[in-house]
Amino acid sequence: MEDVRRRNRGHPLLRSKKRGEGYNHGFSPSQIQSLAVICQTFLPPETTSEQQAVNSFHVASSTQPPFTDEVAEMIVKNGRSEAVKVLRIILMILSFRFGTLLLCGSLCLDKSWPFVLKFSQLPLDKREAILRNWSRQSGFLLPFRITFFLAKFYTLFYFFSQTDENLKNPALEAIGYCIDGTERSSNKKSEADEKRRPLEKGIIETMHESDVTITQSLTEKGVHVARDDGDNVYRIRCDAVVVGSGSGGGVAAANLAKAGLKVLVLEKGNYFTAHDYSGLEVPSMLELYEKGGLLTTVDGKFMLLAGSAVGGGTAVNWSASIRTPDHVLQEWSEGSKIKFFGSQEYQSAMDEVTIRIGVTERCVKHGFQNQVLRKGCERLGLQVESVPRNSPEDHYCGLCGYGCRAGAKNGTDQTWLVDAVENGAVILTGIKAERFVLVDNTSSSNERKKRCVGVFASSVGGKIGKKFIIEARVTVSSAGSLLTPPLMLSSGLKNPNIGRNLKLHPVLMTWGYFPEKDSEFSGKMYEGGIITSVHHMNDTESGCKAILENPLIGPASYAGLSPWVSGPDLKERMIKYGRTAHLFALVRDLGSGEVMMENEVTYRTTKKDRENLRAGLRQALRVSVAAGAVEVGTYRSDGQKMKCEAITKEAMEEFLDEVDAVGGVGTKGEYWTTYFSAHQMGSCRMGVTAEEGALDENGESWEAEGLFVCDGSILPSAVGVNPMITIQSTAYCISSKIVDSLQNKTKV
């Protein structure tokens, strides 16, 4: 068992790390004291009379040092600066008696001198009442709700993510959450095979490099590099440079390298293999996702999940591999007039993609959540379909969102990038593109005013002080829909479509509790394939459409995002975590957003989007009830839920009538929720003219010759299903066109 545990520890970056130095949150002692009391209110200790089996959890509290400092550190590092400022002010005011009176009202009054108590002196029941009241505030009192959300989320998120040096957390053990050997035990590969690094021959990890070693490492990989001490840069020459290694970048790099071009891939994240993945929720999120998986829209309404490691989103996606729907292709080819979407070329590209990433159509064994979805649909007479996956039919990994520890999921790091390095491509990790290098275009055969001649980049998190200038004949941006537009805008491009038309596939979640005793469903919510089933809801009467599927949601995320009404209620939710099946409703959005700068995303849903989500939520709840849930609910801030035992049809419909797609944390209403997006598209779309898109039909910038885009930002609108196959197929077509355009030109 100890051998298994050692093998499951994973890469040091994917494990909980002991803090080796002081804190940088900047909170004063009085602010920390106020925050500590708020943390303890969210997760208070209880009496030791609780049943012994979960005693270690029920008596657990969030007051032990250095808990509050860690929470403060996470808030400052990941929270939006405006929200953090609000929190600091409120924490300071709460440290005074009359400040507490101002913010908390009569609940802080006492019969004894000095008659007004500080927040830290209030009994638990009054503190809970104050926090519940803050959660309901809006308008000019919105800062209270923001404080509530920030403190609640990070308190619970950290509590259920911290582990000791043995990767243990008593709270996780108490709720029955155990991942030791979950996927690897079923994997027949030897330890030597697990440790194999498929990209080894072509990868340079700059976190292991310095200014002394980097030139030699590049030269050994066949890359032309010169050290320019005058400009304090490394000048690199290649045929093609690709920024990003996800769905688009991986495919583009492979096609360009196979054509004999010297390709350099820049990836700001790190490289991990199956042996490296720990399966630990928060350490994995912090390393594998953009902004640690904690990126939100400016108003806090959406949480945005986007991959940020070698393989990009394909390293952390949930395996769904769905071809572009025919009606979407028709819309794009006829409505948007992008003809290749309606061509045989695109169909052939989808064929090539599905073959290369090993898409299978069947699932041998469904996990707990998918069993619930299938049974509920069956009992309601609803059609449920199997979801194609880029993994074997017997793949039973419920933690692929933290990297596939079985090594069975065929992301670009296992497929297209392997093809690329086998054909001489080099991947530089820990390198962030800062801007494209644009010069005046003197070509008489091209109307574009600028010409892209490469990328200006820098090392992140390593010991390399000099910048990089990569000179290339072709530059491909595959940084994703959240990062390609800011990169293009920071380079001086001005097309009005850059950064606009962002689509998110908005998601809202429901849950249903299924006690293990006498249940027809086996397993835990985190076991088995994440998405193996789907129900396409299409209400002909209302015209509402949504898809229902199951998510991965780890205990820390579940605790942080679940509605909070009291400490005991939260602990009860967590005890039920393993047998709480989640269903989400996803819609093909008509609304859109903007991303002009990194981490600055705005988005607006339309009335129709909200109607679709509302219908999807109600359908998901019906499915859970039909499957036999004893209790169901939503993520609405007040803890909206319903007991299902002996429920009448009338009572259920009355409950469902109250279910709605309420606004986000910044909404004016009393109730709010958190929306999610794991698919970002359209923020640098193609168009037949510069007025209709930022790129032409070949994926080339209307403003800069030689600058192409191969990622989800290029898509004309939302796909309506997981966009991985669509992005890879589009990148396949575009990169093939790039090769054709260069075939008669001399390589570098």
UniProtKB/Swiss-Prot annotation:
Q: Which GO terms describe its cellular component?
A: endoplasmic reticulum; membrane
Q: Where is the active site?
A: H679
Spell out the protein name for this chain. Answer: Long-chain-alcohol oxidase FAO4B
SUPFAM superfamilies with a match to the protein in the record? FAD/NAD(P)-binding domain (SSF51905)
Keyword match Nucleotide-binding: no
Q: Does the keyword Transport apply?
A: no
The molecular function terms in GO held by this entry are: flavin adenine dinucleotide binding; long-chain-alcohol oxidase activity
**Reactions that this protein is recorded to catalyse:** a long-chain primary fatty alcohol + O2 = a long-chain fatty aldehyde + H2O2
- Under which main EC class is this enzyme filed? oxidoreductase
Its family remark reads: Belongs to the GMC oxidoreductase family.
Disulfide feature: none
Amino acid composition bias (Basic residues), ranges on this chain: 1-18
Tell me the function of this protein: Long-chain fatty alcohol oxidase involved in the omega-oxidation pathway of lipid degradation.
Compartments where located: Membrane
Q: Which PANTHER family does the UniProt entry name for this protein?
A: LONG-CHAIN-ALCOHOL OXIDASE
Under Enzyme Commission nomenclature, its number is 1.1.3.20
- Residues annotated to bind FAD: 238-253
Q: Which UniProt keywords apply?
A: FAD, Flavoprotein, Membrane, Oxidoreductase, Transmembrane, Transmembrane helix
The residues that cross the membrane are 89-109, 140-160
The protein's gene is named FAO4B
Indicate how the chain sits in the lipid bilayer.
Multi-pass membrane protein
